[in-house]
Every structure is written in C-alpha cells, then in structure tokens.
C-alpha cells in the first residue's frame, strides 16, 4: 500500500545511513516539525515506508514520544535487541544501501477519558491506548492488501530472512561470550 493512500499519517523524518558506527542507521527528523510532536506521550502508530510503500506498521505508548520509540530500532545493534527490531534495522540499512528512500510516518489519537479500575476502586483518567489504533491500522491494511506489510513478519506468519536471523544469533553469541 502506498503511503499516499493513508489519510491520517504525518511524516516525521527520513532514515539515514550512519558511517563508522555500530548502529547502521539513524533518523533525520523534519526540521520544520514542532519538537513537541517528537516527544509527546500520546499513543502512536509508526509507519516505516520504503520508496512510498508501507513496509512496517507498529505502535507504542513509550514515554518520550516517537523519538523514544524509534530509539529501539536505531540502536538495535547495541544492548540486547529482540529479533524484530534487529532485523528491521538491517532491512532499513539494506534498503538505504540500495538507494531506496526510507521514511518514518506517524499517526496519533487524542487521549480519552475512561473509568479505570485500580486495587481499591475506580477513577476517571485520561488514557492513550495504542493497541486498538495499531489493530485498526493493520486491519485497514489487510482489508486492501490481503496481507500485512512485508516487515510485519509475525502477523504474516513468515520467518525472518535467514541471513538476518543468523546475524542476530551471531550478535548475541558474541555479546554473551564477552561477559
């Protein structure tokens, strides 16, 4: 699906290659974008776009906004990354090396007032749930394409590219041997 078909997303940046760094990619956020948008704690859906085509749909409510959410992808060559972020990091790197344009778009929804149960009763609080938004976005995509975006491996019940899954295993083996 082309990003042009999406009516609710805003572009927030472009992925770039990093030189001489463990992490192979970075994001250049749009300079004219209000910085508050990048760090706002609203529930958010992110769309990773390659040459105009949606490749990945994900969601988050992590503190620190879209910048914090994307740090999991940008810094996937350090620490103890899971397979999905590690592989997507390398897929973005591969696309950029092949001269593709890889962009980041975001969809947010306002917080809503809801009654939430605690241990001793309930209270009205503002909530920002991304899961329903993410599910709707994936469902909308599926209704048009009859599959999920290519990099949503789990939803598509597909294996990760074998070469990249091997790199993930090697990365963790090396990391554990250093301890």
Predicted regions and their residues:
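Boundary/linker segments flanking structured domains
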Residues: 1-43, 47-55, 61-179
